[in-house]
Design a protein with these regions (language model features):
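Twin-arginine (Tat) signal peptide motif
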Residues: 2-6, 10, 128
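Short, intrinsically disordered or compositionally biased N-terminal tails of bacterial proteins
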Residues: 2-3, 22-25
Length: 321
């Protein structure tokens, strides 16, 4: 090969091996800019989480406070938890849940202790990738789940058991639920871990302080008689080691005021507990007897505040002479 031909061959080889100019790169050479959520890289949509049970929803609000995590309420606020399964199983409730599930990454449930909680199975119909966070018991088993009372364990697990004898009325159980949710949400949204853990610490501190103060005051009481107006506050009485007096509400509402007066005179409870405010006639009978009425609502917007307020109110009532 003569010298000009050899130089031409070297020039051709160099041209083939040289990197392409920046302006020559076509669309096929550009990496994907789409995330799993369909948003441009660096602009991913915030974590979206579905919840329905009022205590789970209210607790989750406290945990995600100050973060971009979005909570989707799957059932109307005024709908009791006992009616949520039927609402979500069909019609408007199911349609809205499926629509929300398509854009969500996780659901918060109580399925391990409340088998009628079908929020996750229903949401999974619309989104096979959605994750379940069971607030009562972590699936991985790395964190402790909530403790159930002996009476709850004796009965078959079902909707009535856990919704009547509510384990989250024990401050230790409510703190565990918060821990489970915060841990799982931190793993799903790592950039929010610091704020989520700070919110968890604040919740735990509020519950611990209330429990400590309530225990201190209860220790000073010589006896702890309490009248449970409804069975849904049994767990609170058990957690505080109160002494429920013998009592059974009459079948007819119009007989309640007289029955209350009789029970108060016979047993002299230092407080009356209920999960809802009684009607006017019953409230007047309680007020006339001079016994504090303490209401722990199971649909309070902030279940942490509701529980701490109830614990301290009970302790103050028991400690009074």
């Amino acid at each position: 090969m003569n010298r000009p031909a050899l130089l031409s061959a070297f020039a051709l080889a160099a041209a083939l091996l040289a990197p392409a100019p920046a302006h020559a790169a076509g669309p096929a050479a550009t990496p994907s800019t789409e995330t799993l959520s369909g948003q441009p890289a660096g602009q991913a949509a915030p974590l979206r989480v579905i919840a329905a049970h009022p205590v789970v929803l209210g607790l989750a609000r406290q945990i995600v406070k100050g973060t971009p995590i979005e909570l989707v309420q799957a059932a109307p606020a005024r709908l009791p938890a006992s009616r949520q399964p039927a609402y979500l199983a069909g019609g408007k409730g199911l349609d809205e849940l499926l629509a929300a599930a398509r854009q969500a990454q996780a659901v918060l449930t109580l399925r391990s202790v409340w088998p009628d909680d079908q929020l996750y199975p229903l949401a999974r119909r619309a989104n096979i990738h959605i994750v379940e966070i069971d607030a009562a018991n972590p699936i991985e088993g790395e964190l402790p789940g909530i403790a159930l009372t002996e009476s709850t364990l004796r009965e078959a697990k079902g909707s009535a058991t856990v919704l009547i004898n509510q384990p989250w009325q024990d401050s230790a159980n409510l703190a565990r639920m918060a821990m489970i949710m915060a841990d799982s949400l931190s793993r799903l949204a790592p950039p929010q871990r610091e704020r989520l853990q700070a919110n968890l610490a604040a919740i735990s501190q509020r519950l611990q302080q209330a429990q400590s103060e309530a225990s201190r005051q209860l220790a000073q009481a010589d006896e702890l008689p309490v009248l449970l107006l409804t069975p849904r506050v049994q767990a609170l009485a058990t957690a505080l080691q109160l002494e429920p007096v013998p009592w059974q509400a009459p079948e007819k509402d119009e007989d309640l005021p007289a029955a209350l007066q009789k029970a108060i005179q016979a047993h002299r409870p230092r407080a009356i507990l209920s999960h809802t405010a009684p009607d006017e006639a019953a409230a007047q009978a309680i007020a006339a007897a001079g016994v504090p009425l303490i209401v722990l609502r199971d649909n309070a917007p902030d279940p942490v505040q509701a529980l701490t307020d109830a614990m301290l109110a009970v302790a103050q009532a028991m400690a009074r002479k």
